[in-house]
């Protein structure tokens, strides 16, 4: 009899353990798809040579939360941030060393197919946003510009 009571007491926990992963996974996947904003670009020295292992910081000005990335041997960095549809127009500060660039988040909040992001390049003490180059750079780096 005590064994049945133990099993009866454990049954709700076992059901939750089996069902909970299935309930949580879709939410995580949806969050990944609709809340990603990528900041990528290149870091070069004043002579135009790539800077490897440089740290790049992207700060969400509204909250102060920051995201970090580092350059590879080509000077390329890719920083993934979490910004939802409501974040259009929000300010981000992209910083490498003492050089920074403040940008406004821009994307079509109704488009949940194309990757969202911008390109910011650092050369010497200058930082320049090249939003129009984002898709072509992403295609060269990753090979896709749409979400699956």
List PLM regions with ranges.
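Twin-arginine (Tat) signal peptide motif
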Residues: 1-8, 21
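Beta-strand-rich domain onsets/edges
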Residues: 23-47, 61, 131-148
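Hydrophobic beta-strand segments
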Residues: 54-59
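Short Pro-Gly-centered beta-turn/loop motif in secreted/extracellular proteins
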Residues: 78-89
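Edge beta-strands of extracellular beta-sandwich domains
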Residues: 100-109
